[in-house]
Amino acid sequence: MLGFVGRVAAAPASGALRRLTPSASLPPAQLLLRAAPTAVHPVRDYAAQTSPSPKAGAATGRIVAVIGAVVDVQFDEGLPPILNALEVQGRETRLVLEVAQHLGESTVRTIAMDGTEGLVRGQKVLDSGAPIKIPVGPETLGRIMNVIGEPIDERGPIKTKQFAPIHAEAPEFMEMSVEQEILVTGIKVVDLLAPYAKGGKIGLFGGAGVGKTVLIMELINNVAKAHGGYSVFAGVGERTREGNDLYHEMIESGVINLKDATSKVALVYGQMNEPPGARARVALTGLTVAEYFRDQEGQDVLLFIDNIFRFTQAGSEVSALLGRIPSAVGYQPTLATDMGTMQERITTTKKGSITSVQAIYVPADDLTDPAPATTFAHLDATTVLSRAIAELGIYPAVDPLDSTSRIMDPNIVGSEHYDVARGVQKILQDYKSLQDIIAILGMDELSEEDKLTVSRARKIQRFLSQPFQVAEVFTGHMGKLVPLKETIKGFQQILAGEYDHLPEQAFYMVGPIEEAVAKADKLAEEHSS
């Protein structure tokens, strides 16, 4: 790459290279207008969609410059609008370019959706006449595709007649639904303290290695088994190995069935090794697949994005490549716009809903970083994973005091659920405030009432842990899916003091409260023998 830069620097200033220096080719007034406005996308008509290959007679251009993932293409006539997909001709593999800027002199600056190795100036490029189109419909279930809709699971083409552009408008206000309903996940700490709204947006916050991806896998597993719903998983800029593991674990657990058409999930991957263009668009590809199930089949769809931070990071890389001046902490100046354009499409309509769970990597565990902070504005619930809780060996390492939900309201969840949840949070907060005293003076200096608070809080803390079905092979504990009524009942009884006589280790890594009682009996037997 450095060699390429050196060759460009040493080369004579040809017409094509002069175009890279805006001042050499554009008057000052035009410099301010380099980025053309985003095209307005009409409402989708799936039935009318055809295969996304360029049509005969499409506008033809030629490559005039290649700068890493950015390719400049010059057209003699028929300049393609912003966000149109172009296809490079004369290559063994398909290379799609997306128009990002109009530079003047009939030249467009594009972002490549795959590696640009082997591209040469003068190579022919065709305008597809539309944004990137991808296959949608039931045929995508059980399959893995990339950002441009090509299957990457070595199981042949995706046989569907329906294609949809990845760029679309958010639903109109009149189409949206305003009903509130809990999506029961079977995970105690989530259902009790920060319940997910059906059709809402949920953020999974946490640093590296605290269990975001495992929690997402458990949610896919539970929703497929408990609700029978379709899921779409968009792997954005994460490890290829994790994507591969996830696929094989889904096959083993029956979420994906290779023998027939009963698969419950479609996978869309744009992993760490992909160019920034692919990582910046793969979330939209996954969202487009989910929108089809919502709008055409009236489904309640689950959309998982792992990791939404990588979407922002890729946008930052693309922005720098396009020469935009960075804003705070080096992020793109259009950070809020990019995020809002995507998040507003994730919503509940009168036909169906998309509930989105987004893993959010927090750089250096700093929640004030612009990337996680911008995402916060769009969320209905937050599940914050804490390293301090993970260090105690409590998984899922959800912070019960930092995690929030907009629907934690007695009018929506009911007064019993609300009172138990607030009681649990109060006792945990009291325990937190007593920890300094315990650290300095020890437990003996506490009053009897405070000792009881600490005892119950430690039991609650351990009862918030739960063995996951997808982690059975690592933990050796049988995975549990706990109904909401059982969860509320268990915590209500601990708060009431019904289990003050049980040891706290009995509450660790169990499902419903009955299992804690059985575990306590087993521990007592072992101790007596």
Swiss-Prot record:
The modification Phosphoserine is found at residues 415, 433, 529. Glycans are attached at residue 106. GO terms for cellular component: cell surface; extracellular exosome; membrane; mitochondrial inner membrane; mitochondrial matrix; mitochondrial membrane; mitochondrial nucleoid; mitochondrion. One of its GO terms (biological process) is ATP biosynthetic process. Pfam families: ATP-synt_ab, ATP-synt_ab_N, ATP-synt_VA_C. Mg(2+) 2 binds at residue 238. This is ATP synthase F(1) complex subunit beta, mitochondrial. It comes from Homo sapiens. The gene is ATP5F1B.
